[in-house]
Amino acid sequence: MRDPIETVMNLVPMVVEQTNRGERAYDIFSRLLKERIIFVNGPVEDGMSMLVCAQLLFLEAENPKKEINMYINSPGGVVTSGMAIYDTMQFIRPPVSTLCMGQAASMGSLLLTAGATGHRYALPNARIMVHQPSGGFQGQASDIERHAQDIIKMKRRLNEIYVKHTGRDYDTIERTLDRDHFMTAQEALEFGLIDKVVEVRDVSADESK
């Protein structure tokens, strides 16, 4: 059975742009990157994380002051891969606007709430899910104990990040993330994960850019 992601990538449309040097063809994602749009789509893993971080760093080099727009539709994934994206978002100089379309679960929700304050959005039918990290280990008892200690430290660190970006107190975050907690876009707004639920694009904001 073919990899569904590979199948989708083979169907990525090309767009043709007219320039004074003639025509130039781009795949649709490269063309959107020119508009400072990045997609975080699908499971968060090392390969995807590397590409997203590279795009963030490239856009910073292109213009260190102009906003970057990150569109998120992700079920989450590997914590360390997501943290690489998170740290890069905080590290670069341009503000990163985030928008959830579809879902932002697990690490996807952390990346959504990590956007620049006032610029974290969700479409009306988006779903957001937060929870504590999970994992499984096997081996010697002492190694299992060390892994357990490490994931507890990671849980604490993730809770602190949600506290920072939502304004909620630590105990509230810990209780909310104890089990899978699903939210509508409106509930995510009330919780502090996002700043606005958007139904249509703000045309006036686009015209002012």
Curated annotation (Swiss-Prot):
Q: Which CDD domains match?
A: S14_ClpP_2 (cd07017)
Task: Provide the reaction this enzyme catalyses.
Answer: Hydrolysis of proteins to small peptides in the presence of ATP and magnesium. alpha-casein is the usual test substrate. In the absence of ATP, only oligopeptides shorter than five residues are hydrolyzed (such as succinyl-Leu-Tyr-|-NHMec, and Leu-Tyr-Leu-|-Tyr-Trp, in which cleavage of the -Tyr-|-Leu- and -Tyr-|-Trp bonds also occurs)
Q: What is its main location?
A: cytoplasm
Give the GO biological process terms.
Answer: protein quality control for misfolded or incompletely synthesized proteins
> What are its E.C. numbers?
3.4.21.92
Q: Which NCBIfam families match?
A: PRK00277.1, PRK12553.1
* Free-text function comment from the UniProt entry: Cleaves peptides in various proteins in a process that requires ATP hydrolysis. Has a chymotrypsin-like activity. Plays a major role in the degradation of misfolded proteins.
What is this protein's record name? ATP-dependent Clp protease proteolytic subunit
Q: Its gene?
A: clpP
